[in-house]
């Protein structure tokens, strides 16, 4: 999961104002029914809000690349032929790879 930046006070006040307008349209089904005091509203938004955290969908290639870096050193990298890449055929790249760690 990726955490977003902390919102500024102006963004929070605008969001609270928008929630109040939305709550008036629905009636009293907002924060009063849940029994939240104004001090606990911010904590509730942090823990139950969906705006702070976003699920990051990892592709299989990205996961493989991340875990390969953890377990293998750059010297033991496995060589593969250009025919192995069947999805993206961009031609053979014979450029020598250099180690990025050093």
UniProtKB/Swiss-Prot annotation:
Q: What's the protein name?
A: Protamine-2
InterPro entries xrefs: PRM2 (IPR000492)
Basic residues compositional bias: what residue ranges?
49-102
Q: Which GO terms describe its molecular function?
A: cadmium ion binding; DNA binding; zinc ion binding
The entry assigns this protein to a family as follows: Belongs to the protamine P2 family.
Which BP terms does GO give this entry? chromosome condensation; chromosome organization; nucleus organization; spermatid development; spermatogenesis
Its localization reads: Nucleus; Chromosome
Mark the residues carrying the PTM Phosphoserine.
Answer: 8, 10, 37
Q: Where is this region: Disordered?
A: 1-102
Q: Basic and acidic residues bias: where?
A: 8-17, 39-48
> Which key words tag this protein in UniProt?
Chromosome, Developmental protein, Differentiation, DNA condensation, DNA-binding, Nucleosome core, Nucleus, Phosphoprotein, Spermatogenesis
GO cellular component terms given for this protein: male germ cell nucleus; nucleoplasm; nucleosome; nucleus
- Coiled-coil residues are none
Gene designation:
PRM2
Report where it is expressed, by tissue.
Testis.
PTM comment: Proteolytic processing into mature chains is required for histone eviction during spermatogenesis. Transition proteins (TNP1 and TNP2) are required for processing.
Q: How does it associate, per the subunit comment?
A: Interacts with TDRP.
Keyword Cell membrane set for record: no
Q: Which PANTHER family match?
A: PROTAMINE-2
What is this protein's function?
Answer: Protamines substitute for histones in the chromatin of sperm during the haploid phase of spermatogenesis. They compact sperm DNA into a highly condensed, stable and inactive complex.
């Amino acid at each position: 999961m990726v955490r977003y930046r902390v919102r500024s006070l102006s963004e929070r006040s605008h969001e609270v104002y928008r929630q109040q307008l939305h709550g008036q349209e629905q009636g009293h089904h907002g924060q009063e029914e849940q029994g939240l005091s104004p001090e606990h509203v911010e904590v509730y938004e942090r823990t139950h809000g969906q705006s702070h955290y976003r699920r990051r969908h990892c592709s299989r290639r990205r996961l493989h690349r991340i875990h390969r870096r953890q377990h293998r050193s750059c010297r033991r990298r496995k060589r593969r032929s250009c025919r192995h890449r069947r999805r993206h055929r961009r031609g053979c790249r014979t450029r020598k790879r250099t180690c990025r760690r050093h």
